[in-house]
Amino acid sequence: MKLSFLSLAFAVIFVMAIMYAPQVEAKASADADADADAAASADALAKASAGMLDRILGAVKGFMGS
């Protein structure tokens, strides 16, 4: 059976997303600054996700040869 390039690309993206996934640790916070901590955590997560997506897309472009 022939494997299409689209499914191969999805498989590569899936594997790279697992490889580059950051290790995270959850912590509970019950103090008054919990909302500020949550906003800072959300900003840090957004920046990390954008960087991870850039690396994955760069790797896929390199793999596809474009």
From Swiss-Prot:
| GO cellular component entries | extracellular region
Cellular location of this protein? Secreted
Organism per entry: Tetramorium bicarinatum
Tissue specificity is: Expressed by the venom gland.
Residues of the propeptide region, as annotated, are 27-50
Function, in words = In vivo, this neurotoxin paralyzes about 50% of blowflies (L.caesar) one hour after intrathoracic injection, when tested at high doses (54 nmol/g).
* UniProt keyword annotations, A-Z: Neurotoxin, Secreted, Signal, Toxin
Put simply, this protein is called U8-myrmicitoxin-Tb1a
Major localization class: secreted
